[in-house]
A protein has these predicted regions:
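Short hydrophobic/Thr-rich beta-strand motif most characteristic of the beta2 strand and flanking loop
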Residues: 25-32, 40
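Conserved acidic carboxylate
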Residues: 8
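Active-site beta3 strand of CheY-like receiver
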Residues: 44-50
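Charged docking surfaces used in two-component/phosphorelay signaling
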Residues: 15-23
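C-terminal output helix
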Residues: 106-116
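The feature encodes the CheY-like receiver
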Residues: 14, 56-57, 65, 74, ...
């Protein structure tokens, strides 16, 4: 069973993503902020990380950049799920280590296909 770390500060969004993933037989661990997400990523070694961009404290871009700095987390693929859909945001996200950028709203299928495309 593949393990996915969900980092999302909005509880209802986090619960929706968790539901989508559990419906598709993924093991889900979650954090409501980037600092806790960093700790869980290093400890749990998920197969993929799904994160929001707009979060209080450390935002999603900075979170992704930090993940790519540390040897324990640098190889973990990252999917960003966000309402920020400007091309500039996508380009900046790619520079910070985001592998796939999904804009809200998205479907369960969109999310699962994104995971399957980067986790082998």
């Amino acid at each position: 069973m593949r393990k996915v770390l969900v980092v999302e500060d909005n509880k209802s969004e986090r619960e929706l993503i968790t539901l989508y993933l559990e419906n598709n037989n993924y093991q889900v661990i979650s954090a409501d902020n980037a600092a806790d997400g960093m700790e869980l990523a290093a400890q749990q070694k998920p197969d993929v990380i799904i994160t929001d961009i707009t979060m209080e404290g450390i935002n999603g871009f900075e979170f992704c950049r930090l993940l790519k700095v540390y040897p324990d987390t640098e190889q973990i693929p990252i999917i960003a799920c966000t309402a920020r859909d400007r091309e500039l945001d996508r380009m900046w996200g790619q520079k910070q280590g985001i592998d796939i950028y999904i804009t809200k709203p998205y479907s369960e299928r969109d999310l699962v296909e994104a995971i399957e495309s980067i986790v082998k």
